[in-house]
Amino acid sequence: MQGLNPFHRDQGAGGRPAPVRPAPARPAPVAPRTPRKDPAPSRLAYRLNRMMLRPLVRRLVHVGLPAFLAALVAGIWLSDDTRRANLTGGIDAIVDRIQHRDEFMVKMMTIEGASPVVDKGLRAMLPVELPASSFEIDLEKLRERVLKLDAVETVDLRIKPGGVLSAVVTERVPVVLWRHARGIELLDKTGHRVASVTSREVRGDLPIIAGEGADRAAPEALALIDAAGPILPRLRGLERMGERRWDVVLDHGQRIKLPEDKALQALERAIALNGALHMLDRDISVVDLRQEARPVVRLGLEAQNAIRQARGQPELGPDGTPLAPEATAGNAAKAKKKSG
């Protein structure tokens, strides 16, 4: 058969080489196609995602649930009495060691401006004995207790470096004595009680006021005493009448009854009258100024009896009742004997 082919195997027409034809390539194996996932979520996932968009649900999941689990675990762990006692004891021991460190200890107390009685009372009010931890001393409560002392007006408490508890005390200054049914007490300028005394001679340098409610009107009483001026040497005190007004008590049993209002102005008028007329040097027992438009003067017993004798009337006794004629004659004889 080769002889029948005028061309060579490798030659084409005209003696040219025949083109080489590549063998067809075998197709590559095709991998099995995986089914595509449906991008749409399920109803449950959709609802969960929508719920997580709510702030309350997010906080509940991120904070509430972990906190609940932690509390549950802690509660189970602390349900055992032994573990709970050990934990409490350990915490108390740590706190005690910290509070009793040397830098927190108060070793001494200094008090300034207090009398010996107040100094002793203030030291007795300390809740603990020194040295003690500063955590055991509540300065605010201690200050409230100290201020309950009648003699203390103010107190400044502080813990200074070096473990020193400092107390600077300002005591009340007594300026007047107050006599009442329960005894005699010292009052300051505001009428606050300072201390009790057994008799007026303990503080004879102070003026005295008397009567129920006089302590509440002490500032007014002090103003009246300051205004007494010329009659101050004769002043024995002020008496509160009916918790409404004052009576100025002088020696020889004389009284100046002051009104409920404008008592200071009324006393100044009485002093002016006395300076002009020497009214209080006469036998007058009461000067009644309760009515501004109509002052009243009450004569003393001797002046009244002298007038009654001139009129031929029986004399009056100390209680204001007329005496018998015999007693009147006896008194007249005694008076004549004295004058002779």
Swiss-Prot record:
Keywords: Cell cycle, Cell division, Cell inner membrane, Cell membrane, Membrane, Transmembrane, Transmembrane helix. It comes from the Bacteria. One of its GO terms (biological process) is cell septum assembly. Residues 79-340 are periplasmic. InterPro entries: Cell_div_FtsQ/DivIB_C, FtsQ, FtsQ_C_sf, POTRA. GO terms for cellular component: cell division site; plasma membrane. Residues 1-55 are cytoplasmic. Its main location: membrane. The keyword GTP-binding does not apply. Residues 19-32 have a biased composition (Pro residues). It is a single-pass type II membrane protein. Residues 104-172 form the POTRA domain. It is found in: Cell inner membrane. The chain crosses the membrane at residues 56-78. Residues 324-333 have a biased composition (Low complexity). Residues 1-41, 308-340 are annotated as: Disordered. Essential cell division protein. PANTHER family: CELL DIVISION PROTEIN FTSQ. This is Cell division protein FtsQ. It comes from Paracoccus denitrificans (strain Pd 1222). The lineage of its organism: Bacteria, Pseudomonadati, Pseudomonadota, Alphaproteobacteria, Rhodobacterales.
